[in-house]
């Protein structure tokens, strides 16, 4: 089975309130995911959007195309940076907690991550942006515990 995933992350300030949005499409079906956080960064929300979409899957071994406007996510995976970071135990790298979570999920499937221009003519990316910004602006915000612990420890 093949699956298409569109993702986006948003933050109101960097750091600040943030949110992610994801849309999964398969076999004529569609599922939307989103959530907002009290204090986070845009890159954490971009990566968390991908993670939450992959965590929503109930099967392994899928062919997945992910579309995101995050050069951070695309380059880290498609240029192989994240695998080098992993070999060095993510020493000095931001968002190590999320990258480790991502890699556990990534290895369960055949995934290709594609870049799309944000805030442009890609209707699905625009929908994900709407989901992410609505979540960031909602009154029901979650705590990004790892980020907040690091932020307040500074």
Regions found by a protein language model. Name each.
Residues 1-44, 48, 54-62, 134, ...:
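RNase H-like nuclease fold core
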Residues 7-17, 51-127, 131, 140, ...:
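RNase H catalytic domain
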